Structure formats: structure tokens, C-alpha cells
UniProtKB/Swiss-Prot annotation:
GO terms for cellular component: nucleus. This is Xylanolytic transcriptional activator xlnR homolog. PROSITE patterns: ZN2_CY6_FUNGAL_2. It comes from the Eukaryota. Residues 577-586 have a biased composition (Polar residues). Pfam families: Fungal_trans, Zn_clus. Residues 141-157, 340-359 have a biased composition (Low complexity). It is found in: Nucleus.
Length: 1009
């Protein structure tokens, strides 16, 4: 099985980022590697690229005096240059390499230096040469002259040769620190540019401090962008669009991705507060009004300074996303990459490609791609990605997102990927990939970066937190939550008025953008500006927040996903000749990736079977999460069964990934057909529509979706019983019993389907082994009961020993030695038979399905709230329902034993499993609390199994409620074994206080603290 995918990463331990910007003094072959990004990129990803562009010759090293390059033994000392006069040998180096300068380590001045060779780093000398002290007016005048010369050459006033020579001379003057300047050109320099240059030169005095590097992330780049602008002009003088070189715009973005390509006047600016003054003036990140719906407050005891970099409209602004407790690192300034640098980076990549991005190209797939862009699907995101991560790492993160943890079945490896709704083969197609919104691509990278082991994310402890923070900011800025307006549309301020209200900036589709199909109610959404990609992006954001300690904040994102899915009418099947949303959104030719899709997809601009399946899978995924969170947070259902009553169930994951789509559904009336045609159509249409109650596959849509359908019925029943006016006393008991019996029948149908699933997918050898394992468990249970009776007869002291098998119990807080011995014997039996991977996956599905099914039985007949369960004011413990629920609790604990045998880390469904483990344990806690030493051996063993499972959950998905309940269960198990502490009353009070945090009463919020 996989190692722990979640808790081993301590993401979001943020510290000031080190982003050194390169300037015009670098050669045009160099890449923009700076700060931490340069460390990871050059050490693992871009070393080959750097060697290709940098080469052996380094112009920066060549600028040193000839007699100096042989005397670079000592790394320290004043940087004094001689003027060609022979002098004493200087035991120092004139300049350290970029890596040693960044890491503050000793450098020998060679290329490559010894330090970089030892640690496998890319040795470079491409950073700007700076002088101490404030920049002189003459230097500023030289910069102004160079800028004026660049402007003149780009406007055609000078020939290319003359322009290049002038620029070269200006570069030499500036680099050499010449004191001569041109006064008229200095006067033409604008005051704003002078202020920026002065400010940047003042900040350059603080290069000795790592914190000052963050402050120079923006201004330092602006101060040196003039020479780089000249180099770009010479390389891209044939481009017809002048705005492509505007540092405040993304002129090179393709029109096909106009909605998300350029961050123009309508693009939202999610960063709020005075901390973003350095970026507020950039035209590429204009703001939109903040919505209170998405704002949040900092948790108690968590302070963020006024200069903190926040996401004003994200629920993650004050919350860490890892399983750790709140980290003060989130209050530190985390600069965002300047918009201009993303443009320079993309243009530099375009320069290396054989075909550049055309400013007027519709769609980016027809144009050339960067040489190392392995997956062209990332093309729309390249202009926005900037210097956050290398493109090679982005491709690796895409691979991780679609990685499967099993060779026999398709199962997501990342714990934050709940199920595959996108088809990998279509997504990663080398020539015609699926057309995606940049926000979706950024969210995929963000999700994969949470658990990636890439050196770029692990070389420095704070690297993962900073990279994930930047990817999160990029995702939300591209998504524009609740807005979803294309960037090329008019701004919300100047949008047309509809019935006296300006609605264009609130995510409402404007007149003329609604198709007739949407008006008829068959396809599309009336008044919705979002797309399928936006729903998936919301799912990614909400999933990561739900896995953190701040689960309540995830409801904001889930509500947005559910609402948009309903607006897009994903719960309905589309007509046969419905238009394709892909062609409408991208303005490019239809994306037919393989012969199968083309054969089943119909004519041009008609929705394909793959798009239909995407719609189904997205709907059923949000349907699953809606039912799951209704139990977690004690909330009513959002999505109704009637909304998807005619929607087909998703395909099997393996069939979907292989492109084995269903045949088209015949819409002819069966009464109009002959008998043979009617029987043929019946066989084709024998597909499951609407919610189902039977297990059909190994994936989340096969075994877990039916359980969530039944859970939705239980949630509705529970809220109806607890209604303040129309509750338990408003209807007769017979009506409640009939509804309960119907839900129990659905659970029986699921249990029968599990048996058929076992016979269908489990090999004969595995079935025989399963029967032998069941017999061994029965024998072990009988042996445990005999040992317990012998122990009760022999002694009543706290330190008594179990004589059988010479095994002693040494710790009441751990599982009994007998149970551990039996489990070890079972594991040995399992390993000796060498189950195939397919059999292991089937056994895992059977174990998880059996456990959740038994928990649903408990929820149907028992109580949800732990305090009400312990108080037992209505004497439910003496009813038949309690006896029935107790049997299911023991069966659920036995299923957990099977789960721990085949999935020791509980990594198969860590996002969903915790709440069912908790609700299935409340009843065992009640028995242990009430009966104590009189509890049966099966109950004691079940409590031990529950403790082991919670310990595994804490390692895999470290959440507070699991740690708290593990303490409560340990205390109760100690009392069952006769260990009564002196402060028994205080322990009971602490136990009650911990359980009181999670209430499922009328106004309780469950796990959402």
C-alpha cells in the first residue's frame, strides 16, 4: 500500500519568500531563476536547460579583471578592483555565485563553484551587479537615456543595427558606473519612473537581509526592466501587437482563452488591504468588489499583522490547510509574483520555441509550445504561471494528479482527489488536449502540490507552503468566485442595467449570451456564467479546506459548487444533438481526441459522449459530498433526488479512462417499434438512471455512491424527526416505522449487492481464503472469551497476567495482546497466500462497504449525538433498537479489522472515512461507559479495534476530533478493564467536555467547529 500521503507533509509554514529578479544586464539566453525558485529549479528541473542556454562562457565572469580571476580563494573581504596596476594578491573573490549568495555560503568564485558541485546545484552568475549606497543622479540619468533610446528604436526612429549598438553602449555605461549622463533625456524621464528607480536603489542597500529580498520582488524588477525590454524588442520586433510587450498586460494571450487569459480591467483582484500597495497599481490585477459571503475571520488566538499578505475573498485567508494546528507563519508577508514577470517568463519561453504565440491566434493549441512543456493542456496557464513553479514541475504535478494507487483498478493516489471526473487520456493528449480554463489548471497544480515529493517543494522547509500559497492566489484570481465573467467583458461598474439593477458583475449572464437551449430548460443554465471547469475548481478548493481543521469554512466553497452545478443543470441528461460547451467556450475546433469519441460524438459542435460523462461524474461527485457533509455538519441536504431522477449513473472508472462509452440512447417511442427492435432497445437502455442502492464497481461511484444515496434518506428522516413543530409527535409511530423499514430494505439491497460483487470479482482462491479467515476469526473470538473468563476467575488485581500463550497485558491503553496476536496470525495467513492486486482491491471495497453499511444501520435506528446517547434520558438503552444497533456496532468494528489488514494506513478513502468511524464508535463508548467491567469480550475487542483505527487515522489525516475521541475511548477502555483512577469524576467531566464539542442536536454543527 502507499505510504502516508497526508500527514507527512507540513505545508504552509510560510516565511518571507526570496525572489531575486533578474534585470537587463543578463544575456538573453539566461532563464529567470531567482531565490528559492532558482534553487529548486536549477537543482532538479532546469539544469539541462540552463546548461543549454548559459554554456561555458559566462559574460558576468568575463567582466572581471584578467588578473583577478586567478586569485579567488577567500570568500570574504572588501570588493576592491585595481585599475590594471599590479598590486598585492587579494585572497578573496570579487563575486559569489547566485546560489552561494542566496544561501549565504562560502563560494570559491569558480564556475561552477565547489559548493554547487557538492550539492548538485546549478551555478550561475546572472544576478545584477549592484553598488552600495544610494544611486546617484547620474546613474539614474543613464538609465533614463537607455530607456529613451529603447523607446526610439522600438518606434522605428532608428535602424535595428543602430538600436542594438546604442543599447549595447548604454549597457556598458550603466554597468561600468559611468558618471556621464544626458541631461535632456533625464528631464524626459517621468517622475513616477524616477520614484520607482529611487525606491528600488534604496532597497538594494539591504541585500544583506533575506527579508529585504521580498520587498524587492516587485520594485527591483521594475527598476531593471528597461534593458530587458530592449532585448525583448529586438527579439520580437516582428510581432504585430504592440501590447504584447506592455508589462502591465498580457497581450500575447490567445483570443480563444479570452475569458481567462488576460487579467484585464474586469479581472478580479482578490488581495485586499493596505499590504498590497506595491501591487495595487498594476493593470494586470485590477480589483473587483469584495463580497461578504467569502470573507472570514481569523481563528481565536491567531493574529495577522496589518502588513500580512491576505486573500480577501478566500476562506483560506486566515486558516492553514494542513492537518497541523494554526501556524503563525500565515501572518508573515508572502509576496505574490508581479504580473509583469509572468509576461516576461512566457515571452522568454516563446522565444525558445520554434513558433511563438500569436497575439491574434484563436486558441493556443495550434501554435507552438515551449520545448519542455510536456503537456500542451497547460498552454492557457503559461502566461499566468510566471515564476511560481517551472513548467517541468507543473507537468509532473499533472502526472501526480492523475496517478493511481493501484495497478489493477483506477484509484486516485492523492487524498485530495475524491474521484476522477476528467479523462486522463483526453487531458494529456499530445496534440489536441481537452480545452481547460486556467483556473482549473491552477487548482489541479495546487491540489497536487499538497502531497508532491518533488525536490522543488521539499528542498527547503518553507517551500511547499509558499508555493501552495502562490498557486492558491493564482487559482482564486483566475476563478473570480461567484463572478465567472470573461475578462474581455465590460467591467461590473459599467455593465448594463437590467430592470434597474446592474447585474453584470454578479455572475449573471448578460442579454445575448443565453442560448435558446438554455431558455427552453433542456441544456445549459439560465443566467449562469460559470462552466464545468469552474465547478471542478470549486471542488478542489473545498476539498482541501474540508480536510483541514477549519471545516466550516469549506461550506462556502461547497455551496458555490452545488449552486453552480444546479444552475448548469448537471443533473439532467442532454439531448442527442446538444451543442458542445467546449466549442462555445474556446472558439476552437472540436476536441476529438480518439476514434472512439469521434465515432460516438456526432457531428461538429455537438456534445461528445466524453462531455456527457464529465457532466454526470461532476454531478454525482457533488451529490456524494452533499450527503456526506450533511452527516458531518448536521445540515440538511442541498441537492435533491428529484433533480437527478433521470440522470445516468457514471461509467466504471476503468471503462471511462479507456474511452469505452455507452452507445447512444434511442429516443424513439418503444410502442412505435417492432418486437425485435423493442427488445434490442430494451437491452441498450437497461442502464441505471437516478439514485441507486447497489454496489456496482471498485470506484467511488460504484461502492460509495449507493451508500450516500441511502444516507440522504436517513438525513431527511432524522431532520423530520427533530423538526421543532412537525417532529416525532406530529406523525404516528406507524408512519415513522414504515419509512424506517423502507430505508432498511435499501440497506439490505446494498448488502446483497456486496455479496454478488464478491462472487463476481473475487477469485476462487481468495474466496476460499476469506472463508478460512472467517473461521479463524470465530475461533479467535471464542478463545478470547475463554481467556476473559479465566482472567475474571483468577484475579481482580490491576496487574494480573494472561497465562495462555505467555502473553501479558502491559498497557490498558493499547489493544490486548491476544487481539494483536490473532491479527498478526491473520496477516501471516493473508501474506502466505499471495493475493493478487485485484483481489486486494476487492477485499478493500468489501471491507469499507460493509463498515459504512453497518454505520448507516446505527444512524437509522440510533442516536447521533454523543451527549444525548450517554445521558439516555428516554431510556433508549433498554429498547430493542439499542440491541439491534449494538450488533451493527460490533459488525462495523469487525469490518474495521479487515480494513486494517488490507489498508493499514486507512488511505483508501481518508477524506470520507473519519465520520463513519466516529459515529460507529459512539455506541461502543456508551456500552463501555455503562457496563464497564461487565462488558462482553466482543465489545472490548471492538473498542480495541476502534482505538487502533483512530491511531491510524491520526497518522493519515490528522484532525482534532479524532485525537479527542481516541483519548475518550482509551479512558473508557481502561475502566472496562478495571483500572479506576483516583480522579474518576474529573476524567468523566473532561470526557464530557470533549464530546460536547461535536453535537448533532437541533442546533449542533457536528464536526464544523
Amino acid at each position: 500500500m502507499l505510504s502516508n500521503p497526508l500527514h507527512r507533509f507540513s505545508g504552509y509554514h510560510a516565511m518571507p519568500s526570496n525572489t531575486l529578479m533578474s534585470n537587463g544586464h543578463m544575456s538573453q539566453g539566461h532563464l529567470h531563476n531567482n531565490g528559492l525558485d532558482g534553487l529548486g529549479q536549477s537543482s532538479h528541473y532546469a539544469l539541462q536547460q540552463l546548461q543549454q542556454h548559459v554554456g561555458v562562457h559566462n559574460p558576468h565572469l568575463a567582466r572581471a579583471a584578467p588578473h583577478m580571476k586567478h586569485h579567488r580563494q577567500h570568500p570574504y573581504g572588501p570588493a576592491v578592483r585595481t585599475a590594471g596596476i599590479a598590486g598585492p594578491i587579494r585572497r578573496r573573490i570579487s563575486r559569489a555565485c547566485d546560489q552561494c549568495n542566496q544561501l549565504r555560503t562560502k563560494c570559491d568564485g569558480n564556475h561552477p563553484c565547489a559548493h554547487c558541485i557538492e550539492f548538485g546545484l546549478g551555478c550561475e552568475y546572472i544576478r545584477e551587479r549592484k553598488k552600495r549606497g544610494k544611486a546617484s543622479r547620474k546613474d539614474l540619468a543613464q538609465q533614463a537615456a537607455a530607456q529613451a533610446a529603447t523607446t526610439g528604436s522600438s518606434s522605428g526612429q532608428k535602424s535595428p543595427t543602430h538600436s542594438a549598438n546604442t543599447t549595447k553602449k548604454d549597457d556598458q555605461k550603466v554597468d561600468g558606473g559611468s558618471s556621464t549622463g544626458n541631461a535632456p533625456n533625464s528631464e524626459q524621464h517621468s517622475p513616477d519612473d524616477k520614484d520607482l528607480d529611487n525606491d528600488a536603489m534604496q532597497r538594494s542597500q539591504r541585500m544583506g537581509s533575506m527579508d529585504s529580498l521580498d520587498e524587492m520582488d516587485h520594485q527591483g524588477h521594475i527598476s531593471g526592466h528597461h534593458h530587458q525590454q530592449a532585448a525583448l524588442d529586438r527579439e520580437h520586433h516582428t510581432m504585430s501587437n504592440p501590447s504584447a510587450l506592455d508589462p502591465n498586460s498580457y497581450g500575447g494571450v490567445h483570443n480563444g482563452y479570452e475569458r481567462q487569459g488576460g487579467m484585464g480591467t474586469a479581472t478580479s483582484h482578490i488581495m485586499g488591504g493596505a499590504a498590497h500597495g506595491g501591487y495595487g497599481s498594476q493593470g494586470g490585477m485590477s480589483s473587483y468588489p469584495e463580497l461578504p459571503y467569502l470573507q472570514t475571520q481569523s481563528p481565536t488566538g491567531y493574529s495577522g499583522g496589518g502588513a500580512s499578505y491576505r486573500i480577501g475573498t478566500s476562506p483560506l485567508s486566515a486558516y492553514p490547510l494542513s492537518g497541523e494546528t494554526a501556524s503563525p507563519g500565515w501572518g508573515l508577508p508572502i509576496p505574490s509574483p508581479p504580473a509583469s514577470h509572468g509576461q516576461y517568463h512566457s515571452q522568454h519561453m516563446q522565444q525558445q520555441s520554434s513558433a511563438s504565440y500569436g497575439a491574434g491566434t484563436s486558441g493556443g493549441l495550434a501554435s507552438g509550445h515551449p520545448q519542455h512543456l510536456r503537456y500542451p493542456v497547460l498552454d492557457p496557464l503559461v502566461p499566468h504561471l510566471g515564476n511560481i513553479i517551472p513548467l517541468s514541475l507543473a507537468c509532473d504535478l499533472i502526472d501526480l494528479y492523475f496517478a493511481s494507487s493501484s495497478s489493477a483498478q483506477v484509484h486516485p493516489m492523492s487524498p485530495y482527489v475524491l474521484g476522477f471526473v476528467l479523462r486522463k487520456r483526453s487531458f494529456l493528449h499530445p496534440s489536441k488536449p481537452r480545452l481547460c480554463q486556467p483556473a482549473l489548471l491552477a487548482s489541479i497544480l495546487w491540489v497536487a502540490a499538497q502531497t508532491s515529493d518533488a525536490p522543488f517543494l521539499t528542498s527547503v522547509p518553507s517551500a511547499r507552503g509558499k508555493i501552495c500559497q502562490k498557486l492558491l492566489e493564482l487559482t482564486v484570481s483566475l476563478l473570480k468566485p461567484l463572478i465567472h465573467t470573461p475578462s474581455g467583458d465590460v467591467s461590473p461598474v459599467s455593465s448594463p442595467v437590467i430592470d434597474g439593477a446592474a447585474l453584470g458583475g454578479l455572475g449573471v449572464a448578460m442579454p445575448g449570451s443565453i442560448s435558446m437551449e438554455a431558455l427552453s430548460g433542456e441544456t445549459g443554465a439560465f443566467g449562469a456564467a460559470g462552466t464545468l471547469d469552474d465547478v471542478v475548481t470549486y471542488i478542489h478548493l473545498a476539498t482541501v479546506v474540508s480536510a483541514s481543521e477549519y471545516k466550516g469554512a469549506s461550506l462556502r466553497w461547497w455551496n458555490a459548487a452545488w449552486s453552480l452545478a444546479r444552475e448548469l443543470k448537471l443533473g439532467r441528461e442532454l439531448p442527442q444533438n446538444a451543442p458542445s460547451a467546449m466549442s462555445d467556450t474556446a472558439g476552437n475546433e472540436r476536441n476529438d481526441n480518439d476514434d472512439t469519441t469521434e465515432a460516438l460524438g456526432g457531428g461538429p459542435n455537438v456534445i461528445t459522449d466524453e462531455e456527457r460523462e464529465e457532466r454526470r461524474r461532476i454531478w454525482w461527485l457533488v451529490y456524494i459530498v452533499d450527503r456526506h457533509l450533511a452527516l458531518c455538519y448536521n445540515r440538511p441536504l442541498f441537492l435533491l433526488d428529484i433533480e437527478c431522477d433521470g440522470l445516468l449513473q457514471p461509467l466504471d472508472d476503468t471503462a471511462y479512462q479507456n474511452g469505452e462509452f455507452r452507445p447512444h440512447q434511442v429516443v424513439t417511442d418503444p410502442d412505435m417499434l417492432g418486437e425485435d427492435r423493442r427488445s434490442s432497445q430494451k437491452s441498450e437502455t437497461a442502464l441505471i438512471r437516478g439514485p441507486s442502492f447497489e454496489c456496482t464497481g471498485h470506484g467511488i461511484f460504484g461502492y460509495f455512491l449507493p451508500l450516500m444515496t441511502i444516507l440522504g434518506e436517513i438525513v431527511d428522516l432524522n431532520h423530520a424527526r427533530n423538526h421543532p413543530r412537525f417532529g416525532i409527535n406530529f406523525r404516528s409511530h406507524s408512519e415513522w416505522d414504515e419509512q424506517t423499514s423502507e430505508i432498511a430494505r435499501h440497506l439490505e439491497l446494498y448488502e446483497q449487492s456486496l455479496r454478488r460483487f464478491e462472487q463476481q470479482h473475487l477469485s476462487a482462491a481468495a474466496q476460499a481464503q476469506a472463508q478460512a479467515a472467517d473461521a479463524a476469526k470465530a475461533a479467535a473470538a471464542a478463545q478470547a472469551q475463554a481467556h476473559a473468563q479465566a482472567q475474571a476467575q483468577q484475579t481482580s488485581s490491576d496487574d494480573s497476567a494472561i497465562s495462555a500463550d505467555n502473553i501479558s497485558v502491559t498497557d490498558v491503553g493499547t489493544p490486548s495482546a491476544l487481539s494483536v496476536h490473532s491479527v498478526a496470525h491473520s496477516a501471516h495467513t493473508t501474506s502466505s497466500s499471495r493475493l493478487t492486486e485485484s483481489d486486494v482491491q476487492t477485499r478493500i471495497v468489501l471491507a469499507y462497504g460493509t463498515h459504512v453499511m453497518n454505520v448507516l444501520h446505527i444512524l437509522l435506528t440510533g442516536k447521533w449525538d454523543p451527549i444525548n446517547l450517554l445521558d439516555d434520558n428516554d431510556l433508549w438503552i433498554s429498547s430493542q433498537g439499542f440491541i439491534t444497533a449494538t450488533g451493527h456496532a460490533v459488525d462495523a468494528a469487525e469490518a474495521i479489522g479487515s480494513i486494517l489488514e488490507f489498508d493499514p494506513g486507512l488511505e483508501f478513502m481518508p477524506f470520507f472515512f473519519g465520520i463513519y468511524l466516529l459515529q460507529g464508535s459512539f455506541l461502543l463508548l456508551l456500552i463501555a461507559d455503562k457496563l464497564q467491567s461487565e462488558a462482553s469480550p466482543s465489545v472490548v475487542k471492538a473498542c480495541e479495534t476502534i482505538i487502533r483505527a483512530h491511531e491510524a487515522c491520526v497518522v493519515t489525516l490528522n484532525t482534532e476530533y479524532q485525537r479527542n475521541f481516541s483519548k475518550v475511548m482509551r479512558s473508557a477502555l481502561a475502566q472496562v478493564r478495571g483500572r479506576v483512577p483516583e480522579d474518576l469524576g474529573e476524567q468523566h467531566q473532561r470526557r464530557r467536555e470533549l464530546l460536547a464539542l461535536y453535537r448533532w442536536t437541533g442546533d449542533g454543527t457536528g464536526l464544523a467547529l
